[in-house]
UniProtKB/Swiss-Prot annotation:
Renumbered residue ranges of the record's region RNA binding: 243-249, 267-271
Gene that this sequence comes from: tgt
UniProt cofactor note: Binds 1 zinc ion per subunit.
Pathway assigned in UniProt: tRNA modification; tRNA-queuosine biosynthesis
Cofactors named for this entry: Zn(2+)
Protein name: Queuine tRNA-ribosyltransferase
Organism whose genome encodes this protein: Methylobacillus flagellatus (strain ATCC 51484 / DSM 6875 / VKM B-1610 / KT)
Protein backbone atom coordinates (compact mmCIF):
# COMPACT_ATOMS: atom_id res chain seq x y z
CA UNK A 1 0.00 0.00 0.00
CA UNK A 2 1.13 3.53 -0.78
CA UNK A 3 -0.41 6.80 0.41
CA UNK A 4 0.29 9.96 -1.56
CA UNK A 5 -0.69 13.32 -0.08
CA UNK A 6 -1.46 15.48 -3.12
CA UNK A 7 -2.66 18.73 -1.55
CA UNK A 8 -3.53 20.16 1.85
CA UNK A 9 -5.92 23.06 2.42
CA UNK A 10 -5.88 24.01 6.08
CA UNK A 11 -6.13 20.62 7.79
CA UNK A 12 -8.20 19.10 4.94
CA UNK A 13 -6.22 16.58 2.87
CA UNK A 14 -6.46 15.40 -0.74
CA UNK A 15 -4.66 12.14 -1.43
CA UNK A 16 -4.49 8.76 -3.13
CA UNK A 17 -4.34 5.36 -1.44
CA UNK A 18 -2.81 2.85 -3.87
CA UNK A 19 -3.92 -0.71 -3.13
CA UNK A 20 -3.65 -4.14 -4.75
CA UNK A 21 -7.01 -3.79 -6.53
CA UNK A 22 -6.74 -0.13 -7.50
CA UNK A 23 -6.38 3.44 -6.31
CA UNK A 24 -8.71 5.20 -3.88
CA UNK A 25 -9.02 8.97 -4.16
CA UNK A 26 -9.36 10.64 -0.77
CA UNK A 27 -11.34 11.96 1.00
CA UNK A 28 -13.25 8.74 0.27
CA UNK A 29 -16.52 7.22 1.43
CA UNK A 30 -16.86 3.42 1.53
CA UNK A 31 -20.36 1.96 1.08
CA UNK A 32 -21.01 -0.86 3.54
CA UNK A 33 -21.45 -4.36 2.12
CA UNK A 34 -22.03 -6.27 5.35
CA UNK A 35 -22.67 -9.71 3.84
CA UNK A 36 -20.61 -9.15 0.69
CA UNK A 37 -23.27 -6.97 -0.94
CA UNK A 38 -24.35 -3.35 -0.68
CA UNK A 39 -28.01 -3.88 0.14
CA UNK A 40 -30.26 -3.90 -2.97
CA UNK A 41 -27.55 -2.91 -5.49
CA UNK A 42 -25.28 -4.82 -7.88
CA UNK A 43 -21.54 -4.08 -7.90
CA UNK A 44 -21.94 -2.27 -11.24
CA UNK A 45 -24.62 -0.01 -9.76
CA UNK A 46 -22.42 0.70 -6.74
CA UNK A 47 -19.49 1.63 -8.98
CA UNK A 48 -21.76 3.86 -11.06
CA UNK A 49 -22.46 5.95 -7.93
CA UNK A 50 -18.76 6.83 -7.89
CA UNK A 51 -17.54 4.41 -5.20
CA UNK A 52 -13.91 3.27 -5.45
CA UNK A 53 -13.80 0.97 -2.41
CA UNK A 54 -16.26 -1.11 -0.37
CA UNK A 55 -16.35 -2.30 3.23
CA UNK A 56 -17.01 -5.96 4.03
CA UNK A 57 -17.87 -7.41 7.42
CA UNK A 58 -15.39 -10.01 8.67
CA UNK A 59 -17.64 -11.22 11.50
CA UNK A 60 -20.72 -11.90 9.38
CA UNK A 61 -18.83 -13.36 6.39
CA UNK A 62 -16.94 -15.71 8.73
CA UNK A 63 -20.23 -17.02 10.12
CA UNK A 64 -21.99 -17.11 6.74
CA UNK A 65 -21.17 -18.28 4.10
CA UNK A 66 -17.89 -19.18 5.84
CA UNK A 67 -14.26 -19.32 4.82
CA UNK A 68 -14.54 -22.65 3.00
CA UNK A 69 -16.90 -21.06 0.49
CA UNK A 70 -15.10 -17.73 0.05
CA UNK A 71 -11.73 -19.50 -0.06
CA UNK A 72 -12.87 -21.42 -3.14
CA UNK A 73 -13.03 -18.09 -4.97
CA UNK A 74 -9.63 -16.88 -3.81
CA UNK A 75 -11.20 -14.20 -1.68
CA UNK A 76 -14.09 -11.79 -1.43
CA UNK A 77 -13.49 -9.89 -4.69
CA UNK A 78 -14.29 -12.75 -7.05
CA UNK A 79 -16.98 -14.14 -4.74
CA UNK A 80 -19.01 -10.91 -4.81
CA UNK A 81 -18.04 -9.74 -8.29
CA UNK A 82 -16.30 -6.53 -7.21
CA UNK A 83 -12.88 -5.91 -8.76
CA UNK A 84 -12.03 -2.76 -6.81
CA UNK A 85 -10.43 -2.43 -3.37
CA UNK A 86 -12.14 -3.83 -0.26
CA UNK A 87 -11.60 -2.96 3.40
CA UNK A 88 -12.74 -5.48 5.99
CA UNK A 89 -13.35 -4.70 9.64
CA UNK A 90 -11.97 -7.12 12.20
CA UNK A 91 -15.22 -8.24 13.83
CA UNK A 92 -14.50 -6.37 17.06
CA UNK A 93 -17.42 -3.96 16.74
CA UNK A 94 -19.91 -6.73 15.89
CA UNK A 95 -18.77 -8.79 18.88
CA UNK A 96 -19.10 -5.67 21.07
CA UNK A 97 -22.66 -5.15 19.82
CA UNK A 98 -23.66 -8.64 21.02
CA UNK A 99 -23.68 -7.27 24.58
CA UNK A 100 -24.39 -9.93 27.19
CA UNK A 101 -24.06 -12.70 24.59
CA UNK A 102 -20.25 -12.39 24.65
CA UNK A 103 -17.43 -12.82 27.18
CA UNK A 104 -14.17 -10.91 26.77
CA UNK A 105 -10.89 -12.36 28.07
CA UNK A 106 -7.24 -11.52 27.50
CA UNK A 107 -7.10 -14.20 24.82
CA UNK A 108 -10.14 -13.08 22.83
CA UNK A 109 -13.93 -13.06 22.80
CA UNK A 110 -16.22 -16.04 23.25
CA UNK A 111 -19.79 -15.67 22.06
CA UNK A 112 -22.80 -17.50 20.70
CA UNK A 113 -23.37 -17.32 16.97
CA UNK A 114 -26.43 -15.15 16.28
CA UNK A 115 -27.20 -17.51 13.38
CA UNK A 116 -27.35 -20.94 15.03
CA UNK A 117 -26.25 -20.50 18.66
CA UNK A 118 -22.91 -22.29 18.21
CA UNK A 119 -20.10 -21.33 20.56
CA UNK A 120 -17.51 -19.20 18.74
CA UNK A 121 -14.13 -17.86 19.79
CA UNK A 122 -12.60 -14.87 18.02
CA UNK A 123 -9.03 -13.77 18.72
CA UNK A 124 -6.66 -11.31 17.04
CA UNK A 125 -4.92 -14.24 15.36
CA UNK A 126 -8.19 -15.72 14.09
CA UNK A 127 -9.38 -12.34 12.81
CA UNK A 128 -6.14 -11.94 10.83
CA UNK A 129 -6.50 -15.47 9.45
CA UNK A 130 -10.08 -14.78 8.35
CA UNK A 131 -9.16 -11.50 6.68
CA UNK A 132 -6.25 -13.16 4.85
CA UNK A 133 -8.70 -15.65 3.34
CA UNK A 134 -11.02 -12.76 2.43
CA UNK A 135 -7.96 -11.17 0.73
CA UNK A 136 -9.14 -7.68 1.61
CA UNK A 137 -6.91 -4.82 0.46
CA UNK A 138 -7.11 -3.20 3.90
CA UNK A 139 -7.23 -5.37 7.03
CA UNK A 140 -8.30 -3.91 10.38
CA UNK A 141 -6.74 -5.02 13.66
CA UNK A 142 -8.91 -6.87 16.16
CA UNK A 143 -9.86 -4.47 18.94
CA UNK A 144 -12.41 -3.94 21.67
CA UNK A 145 -14.81 -1.10 20.98
CA UNK A 146 -14.91 0.84 24.26
CA UNK A 147 -18.55 1.11 25.35
CA UNK A 148 -20.29 4.39 26.07
CA UNK A 149 -20.53 5.52 28.76
CA UNK A 150 -17.36 4.22 30.42
CA UNK A 151 -15.47 5.37 33.50
CA UNK A 152 -11.86 6.52 32.97
CA UNK A 153 -10.62 3.29 34.57
CA UNK A 154 -12.81 1.04 32.41
CA UNK A 155 -11.97 3.02 29.27
CA UNK A 156 -8.25 2.70 30.01
CA UNK A 157 -8.47 -1.05 30.65
CA UNK A 158 -10.34 -1.45 27.36
CA UNK A 159 -7.84 0.71 25.47
CA UNK A 160 -4.84 -1.18 26.87
CA UNK A 161 -6.44 -4.51 25.94
CA UNK A 162 -6.92 -3.20 22.40
CA UNK A 163 -3.24 -2.18 22.31
CA UNK A 164 -2.13 -5.68 23.33
CA UNK A 165 -4.46 -7.12 20.70
CA UNK A 166 -3.02 -4.66 18.16
CA UNK A 167 0.48 -6.06 18.73
CA UNK A 168 -0.86 -9.61 18.34
CA UNK A 169 -2.73 -8.60 15.18
CA UNK A 170 0.48 -7.14 13.70
CA UNK A 171 2.41 -10.32 14.49
CA UNK A 172 -0.30 -12.56 13.03
CA UNK A 173 -0.53 -10.40 9.88
CA UNK A 174 3.07 -11.16 8.92
CA UNK A 175 3.18 -12.76 5.48
CA UNK A 176 0.01 -11.03 4.29
CA UNK A 177 0.99 -8.43 1.65
CA UNK A 178 -2.21 -6.42 2.17
CA UNK A 179 -2.36 -3.27 4.31
CA UNK A 180 -3.04 -3.38 8.07
CA UNK A 181 -4.63 -0.45 9.92
CA UNK A 182 -4.51 0.21 13.65
CA UNK A 183 -7.56 1.50 15.55
CA UNK A 184 -7.37 4.27 18.16
CA UNK A 185 -9.59 3.70 21.21
CA UNK A 186 -9.90 5.45 24.58
CA UNK A 187 -13.55 6.42 24.87
CA UNK A 188 -14.31 10.10 25.45
CA UNK A 189 -10.99 10.79 27.20
CA UNK A 190 -8.35 12.80 25.33
CA UNK A 191 -5.43 11.47 27.38
CA UNK A 192 -6.44 7.87 26.68
CA UNK A 193 -6.77 8.63 22.97
CA UNK A 194 -3.23 10.06 23.07
CA UNK A 195 -1.93 6.96 24.86
CA UNK A 196 -3.64 4.67 22.36
CA UNK A 197 -2.24 6.56 19.37
CA UNK A 198 1.27 6.56 20.84
CA UNK A 199 1.12 2.81 21.42
CA UNK A 200 -0.17 2.11 17.92
CA UNK A 201 2.44 4.26 16.19
CA UNK A 202 5.16 2.49 18.18
CA UNK A 203 3.88 -0.84 16.84
CA UNK A 204 3.62 0.66 13.35
CA UNK A 205 0.74 0.30 10.88
CA UNK A 206 -0.01 1.18 7.26
CA UNK A 207 -2.86 3.46 8.31
CA UNK A 208 -4.71 4.55 11.44
CA UNK A 209 -8.41 4.59 12.27
CA UNK A 210 -10.41 6.40 14.92
CA UNK A 211 -12.74 3.86 16.50
CA UNK A 212 -15.24 3.98 19.34
CA UNK A 213 -17.17 7.01 18.07
CA UNK A 214 -20.81 7.19 17.02
CA UNK A 215 -21.62 4.59 19.70
CA UNK A 216 -24.27 6.64 21.52
CA UNK A 217 -22.25 9.63 22.73
CA UNK A 218 -23.48 13.22 22.25
CA UNK A 219 -22.43 14.77 18.95
CA UNK A 220 -20.35 17.41 20.72
CA UNK A 221 -18.27 14.68 22.41
CA UNK A 222 -17.66 12.98 19.08
CA UNK A 223 -16.52 16.24 17.50
CA UNK A 224 -14.35 17.04 20.53
CA UNK A 225 -12.48 13.73 20.33
CA UNK A 226 -12.22 14.04 16.56
CA UNK A 227 -10.76 17.56 16.74
CA UNK A 228 -8.31 16.48 19.45
CA UNK A 229 -7.12 13.22 17.91
CA UNK A 230 -6.94 13.71 14.15
CA UNK A 231 -4.19 16.38 14.02
CA UNK A 232 -1.91 14.11 16.09
CA UNK A 233 -2.21 11.16 13.70
CA UNK A 234 0.75 10.43 11.37
CA UNK A 235 0.79 12.81 8.41
CA UNK A 236 2.11 10.22 5.97
CA UNK A 237 -0.57 7.56 6.61
CA UNK A 238 -4.28 7.40 5.73
CA UNK A 239 -6.67 8.44 8.50
CA UNK A 240 -9.95 6.55 8.73
CA UNK A 241 -12.99 7.53 10.85
CA UNK A 242 -15.03 4.37 11.45
CA UNK A 243 -18.82 4.27 11.28
CA UNK A 244 -19.44 8.00 10.71
CA UNK A 245 -21.76 9.49 9.61
CA UNK A 246 -24.08 12.25 8.38
CA UNK A 247 -23.04 14.53 5.50
CA UNK A 248 -22.35 17.22 8.11
CA UNK A 249 -20.12 14.81 10.05
CA UNK A 250 -18.11 14.01 6.93
CA UNK A 251 -17.44 17.65 6.08
CA UNK A 252 -16.50 18.41 9.70
CA UNK A 253 -14.15 15.41 9.85
CA UNK A 254 -12.45 16.28 6.55
CA UNK A 255 -11.87 19.79 7.93
CA UNK A 256 -9.85 18.13 10.74
CA UNK A 257 -7.84 15.97 8.32
CA UNK A 258 -9.73 12.65 8.03
CA UNK A 259 -9.26 10.78 4.72
CA UNK A 260 -11.63 7.79 4.79
CA UNK A 261 -15.14 7.01 6.03
CA UNK A 262 -17.73 4.25 6.14
CA UNK A 263 -21.29 4.30 7.40
CA UNK A 264 -24.57 2.43 6.88
CA UNK A 265 -26.47 5.73 7.00
CA UNK A 266 -26.93 6.40 3.26
CA UNK A 267 -28.08 2.83 2.52
CA UNK A 268 -30.14 2.26 5.68
CA UNK A 269 -31.83 5.65 5.45
CA UNK A 270 -32.59 5.02 1.78
CA UNK A 271 -34.52 1.86 2.64
CA UNK A 272 -36.47 3.89 5.21
CA UNK A 273 -37.36 6.59 2.68
CA UNK A 274 -34.92 9.19 4.03
CA UNK A 275 -33.08 10.89 1.18
CA UNK A 276 -30.11 13.27 1.30
CA UNK A 277 -29.88 16.26 -1.03
CA UNK A 278 -27.70 19.36 -1.24
CA UNK A 279 -30.65 21.38 0.08
CA UNK A 280 -31.44 19.13 3.06
CA UNK A 281 -33.14 15.81 3.75
CA UNK A 282 -36.37 14.53 2.19
CA UNK A 283 -38.64 12.09 4.03
CA UNK A 284 -40.66 10.29 1.36
CA UNK A 285 -43.42 9.15 3.72
CA UNK A 286 -44.69 12.74 4.01
CA UNK A 287 -47.91 13.37 2.09
CA UNK A 288 -46.56 16.61 0.60
CA UNK A 289 -44.62 14.51 -1.92
CA UNK A 290 -47.69 12.63 -3.25
CA UNK A 291 -48.13 14.83 -6.34
CA UNK A 292 -44.67 16.38 -6.54
CA UNK A 293 -43.41 16.11 -10.12
CA UNK A 294 -39.86 17.24 -9.28
CA UNK A 295 -36.89 14.91 -8.90
CA UNK A 296 -35.27 14.60 -5.48
CA UNK A 297 -32.60 17.09 -6.55
CA UNK A 298 -32.81 18.96 -9.84
CA UNK A 299 -29.00 19.23 -10.02
CA UNK A 300 -28.34 15.53 -9.28
CA UNK A 301 -27.21 13.36 -12.21
CA UNK A 302 -27.95 9.97 -10.63
CA UNK A 303 -30.21 7.47 -12.43
CA UNK A 304 -33.00 8.07 -9.92
CA UNK A 305 -33.08 11.85 -10.28
CA UNK A 306 -32.77 11.74 -14.07
CA UNK A 307 -35.77 9.43 -14.45
CA UNK A 308 -38.19 9.55 -11.52
CA UNK A 309 -40.28 12.06 -9.58
CA UNK A 310 -40.70 12.52 -5.86
CA UNK A 311 -44.34 11.47 -6.35
CA UNK A 312 -43.30 8.11 -7.83
CA UNK A 313 -40.70 7.50 -5.13
CA UNK A 314 -43.31 8.43 -2.50
CA UNK A 315 -45.68 5.88 -4.08
CA UNK A 316 -43.02 3.13 -4.13
CA UNK A 317 -42.13 3.80 -0.51
CA UNK A 318 -45.75 3.76 0.67
CA UNK A 319 -46.35 0.57 -1.34
CA UNK A 320 -43.30 -1.22 0.05
CA UNK A 321 -41.93 -1.86 -3.44
CA UNK A 322 -38.36 -3.19 -3.63
CA UNK A 323 -37.68 -0.84 -6.54
CA UNK A 324 -38.16 2.08 -4.17
CA UNK A 325 -35.37 0.88 -1.89
CA UNK A 326 -33.10 0.38 -4.91
CA UNK A 327 -33.74 3.81 -6.43
CA UNK A 328 -33.38 5.50 -3.04
CA UNK A 329 -30.09 3.70 -2.38
CA UNK A 330 -28.71 4.69 -5.78
CA UNK A 331 -29.51 8.32 -5.02
CA UNK A 332 -28.14 8.41 -1.47
CA UNK A 333 -24.87 6.72 -2.41
CA UNK A 334 -24.51 9.01 -5.42
CA UNK A 335 -25.09 12.00 -3.15
CA UNK A 336 -22.39 10.84 -0.72
CA UNK A 337 -19.90 10.20 -3.52
CA UNK A 338 -20.64 13.59 -5.10
CA UNK A 339 -20.06 15.19 -1.70
CA UNK A 340 -16.66 13.49 -1.48
CA UNK A 341 -15.82 14.55 -5.05
CA UNK A 342 -16.81 18.13 -4.23
CA UNK A 343 -14.52 18.12 -1.20
CA UNK A 344 -11.63 16.66 -3.20
CA UNK A 345 -12.01 19.36 -5.85
CA UNK A 346 -12.35 22.12 -3.25
CA UNK A 347 -9.14 21.04 -1.52
CA UNK A 348 -7.32 20.93 -4.87
CA UNK A 349 -8.52 24.47 -5.59
CA UNK A 350 -7.64 25.76 -2.11
CA UNK A 351 -11.25 26.68 -1.32
CA UNK A 352 -12.32 24.00 1.16
CA UNK A 353 -13.45 26.48 3.81
CA UNK A 354 -15.72 28.24 1.30
CA UNK A 355 -17.04 24.85 0.13
CA UNK A 356 -17.88 23.86 3.72
CA UNK A 357 -19.72 27.14 4.30
CA UNK A 358 -21.74 26.78 1.09
CA UNK A 359 -22.49 23.15 1.98
CA UNK A 360 -23.85 24.04 5.42
CA UNK A 361 -25.96 26.89 4.08
CA UNK A 362 -27.42 24.71 1.33
CA UNK A 363 -28.24 21.81 3.65
CA UNK A 364 -30.38 24.07 5.86
CA UNK A 365 -32.78 25.09 3.08
CA UNK A 366 -35.20 22.14 3.42
CA UNK A 367 -35.10 21.78 7.20
CA UNK A 368 -38.57 23.23 7.74
CA UNK A 369 -40.38 21.60 4.82
CA UNK A 370 -39.01 18.15 3.99
Amino acid sequence: MEFTLIKQDGAARRGTVSLAHGDVQTPAFMPVGTYGAVKSLSPVEVRDTGAHILLGNTFHLWLRPGLEVIGEFGGLHRFMGWNGPILTDSGGFQVWSLGDLRKITEEGVRFRSPINGDSCFLTPEESMRIQKVLNSDIVMIFDECTPYPATPADARDSMLLSLRWAARSKAAHQGNPNALFGIIQGGMYEDLRDESLAGLTEIGFDGYAIGGLSVGEPKEDMLRILAHTTPKMPQDKPRYLMGVGTPEDLVAAVSHGVDMFDCVMPTRNARNGWLFTRHGDIKLKNARHRKDTRPLDEHCQCYTCLNFSRAYLHHLHRSGEILGARLNTIHNLHYYQELMLGMRQAIEQGRFEAFATEFRQGRQMLQQSA
